[in-house]
Amino acid sequence: MSHLNLATLDTSQHPYLPASSQTLFAAKAKRKFTFEDISKQIGRNEVATAAIFYGQAKASAEDIANLAKVLDIPLKLLEEQLSGFPDRGRSVEMPPKEPLIYRLYEIVQNYGYAYKAVLNEKFGDGIMSAISFSTKVEKETDADGNNWAVITLRGKWLPFSRF
């Protein structure tokens, strides 16, 4: 399960993350697991798994038990650290400075109104949910050997109510 590319955490760069982030990332690094490795073992999507590590998603009791087992973290500690509700949206300053996260921000800056226009034409007046939502990341390699990142966003369409 050991991989060359391993996401780790420099807590000095992320002052707003919860204590659970440090616990989870330290155990992840010690075992040299990727988010894909962990997600397969706990039965979650790898982006959802990473979101738990960054304090941006709620871990179920089953998630907590599975993470404790897979990462060899005391269950009681994880239960204490992951029992609350996430304080979403505080982990990234705006605009973001980290280049990859900034590129995602830039995509919304450049194409946000285009997405909105096309979505409104297809679905009517409303929004795409980020709560009834799923996402995944895939890697594609073209015929020339170039690697492409494919990010799929899937959100329930919520029409605005007339009142």
Curated annotation (Swiss-Prot):
Keyword Lyase: yes
UniProt keywords, alphabetically: Lyase
InterPro entries, per database record: Cyanase, Cyanate_lyase_C, Cyanate_lyase_C_sf, Lambda_DNA-bd_dom_sf
Disulfide feature: none
A Pfam family reported for this protein in Swiss-Prot or TrEMBL: Cyanate_lyase
Entry EC no(s): 4.2.1.104
GO BP annotations, alphabetical order: cyanate metabolic process
Entry function: Catalyzes the reaction of cyanate with bicarbonate to produce ammonia and carbon dioxide.
NCBIfam families: cynS
Name of protein: Cyanate hydratase
Species of the source: Talaromyces stipitatus (strain ATCC 10500 / CBS 375.48 / QM 6759 / NRRL 1006) (Penicillium stipitatum)
Gene field: cyn1
